[in-house]
């Protein structure tokens, strides 16, 4: 049987997620292969505006569209990741899905600051990562649900709506889920 990888899909935290950091999150998987997985939380604002972040990096951002930076995950919170539509045209761009790329180089930040060449995007600080077979084990335990990624979920919906929207994509009303089965 061939192993199914989940790059360009989303993980959905169950309502009773044991790990507080990942409670109520939706994680876009930018990489999943035999060595492990990496993803970006797409529904948790970091409390900083893109203009502020760009100014901190000495990038003139007077014309940037208002947008919140995301808290992408617990690892390397000082590192920036740009999840965006389009082709992998920047220095460190990698295509991860149809019309979805992730870029870590400064040249894309300059383009964002000047509203040039970047369609829809999310900037995240930090990322989540799983070692070999770790994510598969967590999914088997019921630690995560999985849904297909789409442009609305990744880029358009308000952050507060993305968790519920991910549940709707798999046809589940999360209020019906329970962490434990009762006994009569």
From Swiss-Prot:
Q: Where are the transmembrane segments?
A: none
Q: Can you quote a single GO CC term? A: cytosol
Classification via SUPFAM superfamilies? VC0467-like
InterPro entries named in the record? AlgH-like (IPR003774)
Q: Which HAMAP family match?
A: UPF0301
Family membership, please give it.
Belongs to the UPF0301 (AlgH) family.
- State the name under which the record lists this protein: UPF0301 protein ABAYE3454
- This chain's source organism reads Acinetobacter baumannii (strain AYE)
